[in-house]
Each structure stands twice: as structure tokens, then as C-alpha cells.
Amino acid sequence: MKLYNTLTMTKEEFEPLEEGKVKMYVCGPTVYDFIHIGNARPLIVFDTLRRYFEYKGYEVIYIQNFTDVEDKMINRANKEGITVFELAERFIQEYYKDADRLNVKRATKNPRATEEIEDMIALIQRLIDKGYAYVVDGDVYFRTRKFAEYGKLSHKNIEELMAGARVDPNEKKEDPLDFALWKAKKEGEPAWSSPWGEGRPGWHIECSVMAMKYLGQTIDIHAGGQDLIFPHHENEIAQSEAATGKPFARFWLHNGYVNINNEKMSKSLGNFFTVREIIEKYHPEALRLFMLQAHYRKPLNFSIDLIEQAEVALKRIYTCYENLEFLIQNAASSSENDDKLKAAIEELKAKFIDAMEDDLNTAEATGYLFEMVREINTYANSCSKETLTFAKDTLKELCSILGILEQYSAKEEAIPQQILELVEKRNQARKAKNFAEADRIRDELKSLGYIVLDTPQGTKIERIK
């Protein structure tokens, strides 16, 4: 499999450091609010990569952190009159609700920054001992210029970074580019004891510590949104590699931005959607499918029209699968179209896998999936049970890689006995050629929310949605 490595700006063949095992670290949310659809993109994209690795037989150690102490969290907690820890616990649980509904698999571990403070202090002390960090009035800063390769991820030199730097008002720093490893205690903020006085860790050191603690000093893949390349991931590399002398991550993967109606998503513009708002109105898998119909590195434009289109497309997959289940019950033992459908499915599956192998090209892969649905719909009514079962299993197999077709609608609600009895009465009326009575029962079923479809394999009942 080839993956685009931000570090080298090329697609590279992926080989894990340890045979049969992939170690991934994905930057998780700051848990001060409900996750928005911009947060959802890396969740869905890198969950899909994980699923594909597992499909290929790898064991995946998947670590995704929670940033549970940070300026936004402190401000909101103070505003609500609760502790940062209470705020974090509330929104971590809300995160799990949203992620579960999006079929995002649970991480191997979700470490919380506040539970790893001792290890952060130890890493900061190590950087001080090696001359890469210094203390100023209880703050600890990283000496950016001492790390010769600073800028290698964002592909900028120190002068370019200086020109675009937001200068910290703390004039005691040796250099405006130096960044905080530890922040001295301020009024109204949570704090922990350290050799430099009470305070809290900087954001960047949190991820370095959690990644190395649970995955080792060099990991296979570090991933996150494009907005994290600089300064967050650049700073992670600097402090981690300065401390260990080893490469921090072999592959750096970044997903593109999500725009709303072709404008950058922002609360101030009023074009801001939480995941919860979308999945309460639309099928959660529609949001997942929408995200995967674009290449993960490209910008993605979100609109309600597009999510509605994704929901219609998702319905086509579910309908195809449900139809296969129905046809299998009454299928013939053989058919002249068996070979045609099998060949089409095998060819499209191969193309799907090729697309996934090429830098996780889910945009192409979903295209082949819908081609497969069309082929199945074309031939399914005249295929054997064996071929239909093969089609159903393959469709399910590929959808499971994408994380869809997992909230199986047909199983959500059993058809009431009253409806089944009416359908049987209608079947008896049709056998007796009493078509007026059959039509009357059909209309009654429709008024009760069900339609009946007469097929060569029997009567199919569908709930009107």
C-alpha cells in the first residue's frame, strides 16, 4: 500500500516497523464541546485506514488522545462554574456517543492528557538536561533553533517561520519561535506540582508523551488534520526527536479542510454544524459516506444538499443488500447470468482494493462500490442462490472496510403481525383472481405505512420511509 507522507511530500510504500503490526497515533479532540463535522473528518478517514489495515490482516494499535486541559476548556469550565475535569468527562461521553453512531471503532486506548502529567514532567526535564529547553519564571520553553531540522514537516526554514510567527507577548523568551513545554500557574486554572513550580503542560508536549508512552519512541503513522502540520506536529517532532535522538514517526498523514457551502467553516459566520445536529436529521452513515466520497487530502465542501445526496446513495446500498437477502430465500439453483455477475463483482472488487492501496483513495473505491450495486441490481433477479450469496457477502465485505452497512435498517423494526396477516390475505385474494380485494388490501397496507412488491420470487414487504 502506498501512502502520501507529508514529511517527504511523496507517496511511499508502507511497511510497518514490526511485521504484522501497525502503530498509529491520531490527534483527538479538545473535549470542551460537541465535535463538529471538521473534527469528524479525521475520525472517519483514519478509522477507515485502520479498518483497511485490519482487513489486510494487520493488528492495529490505535491511540487517539483527549486534550482535557487547554485554554478553551479552562474558559468554558470557569464560565459554567464547574471544574475542567467535570467538563472533560461530560464531553468525552458525548464524543463516544457521536463516534459510535458514526461507526468509528473504539481506539486501543484514549489517553487523557491530565492522566499523563508525570511522564510529561519527565520528558521536559530530559529536554532541559540536554540543553533543548530552559526555565523562565516557572514557564519552560523549547529552544527551537537548537533543533536543526525544525521546519522539516511544514517544509519551511526558520526565516519563513519567523515571518509568519505569532509572537508570544512573554518577552523573557530567548526567541519568538520558542514554544511552551510548561506553563506557570495562573489564577483560575488547574495546576500540578513540578520542579519549576505549579503549572500545567503545553499542548504539544502532551501528544509527544502519549504517543511514545503507548506506541514507542518511533511509531508507524502519526495522523491528524492539515491544520495541525504547523505548529503542532512540527513541534511534536522537534521535542520528541530532541529527547530521543530517533525519528518520531515514519509516516505523517493529514486530511484536508472541511468547508461549508464553499466557505471556511466558522462559528462567527454562522455556518457551523456539529456532528450531533447532522446525525439527528440524517442517517449517521450518510455523513460517513459523504466524507469518503472525496479523497482525504483534498478540501471537502459540505452542504445540506450534498448530505441529502449521500443519504440517497446510502439507501441504494441498503436496498441492494436487503433485496439480495430476499432473493436468496427463493433463488433457483443455477442461472445463465451467474457467470456475468460473478465476473463483474470480482473485477470491481479488485478495482476497489487497488484504489484503497493507492493512498486510501476512497473516492475511487466508493465509485466502484456503486458500480457493483448497479451490476447486482441488473442481474440479481436471474441468478442462483450461490451467486446471490457471493454478491451479498462481497458487498458486505467492502462496505465493512468503509464502515457502512453496519446499522442494518431492515433489522431495526420487525414487521407487525397485523401487516403479515394482511399480506397473506392479499396473496390469497390474488390466487383466487379477486384483484379488487387484493387492490383494497394493498391500499389498506399503504395507509398503515407499508408497500408490497410482487416479484417472481414472491411478495416483498417494505416500510414506507
Swiss-Prot record:
What GO molecular function terms would the record report?
A: ATP binding; cysteine-tRNA ligase activity; zinc ion binding
Family matches, as SUPFAM superfamilies: Anticodon-binding domain of a subclass of class I aminoacyl-tRNA synthetases (SSF47323), Nucleotidylyl transferase (SSF52374)
Any one annotated GO CC term: cytosol
The UniProt record gives the binding positions of Zn(2+) as: C27, C207, H232, E236
Q: Which UniProt keywords apply?
A: Aminoacyl-tRNA synthetase, ATP-binding, Cytoplasm, Ligase, Metal-binding, Nucleotide-binding, Protein biosynthesis, Zinc
Q: Which HAMAP family match?
A: Cys_tRNA_synth
UniProt name for this protein: Cysteine--tRNA ligase
- The gene that this protein is the product of is cysS
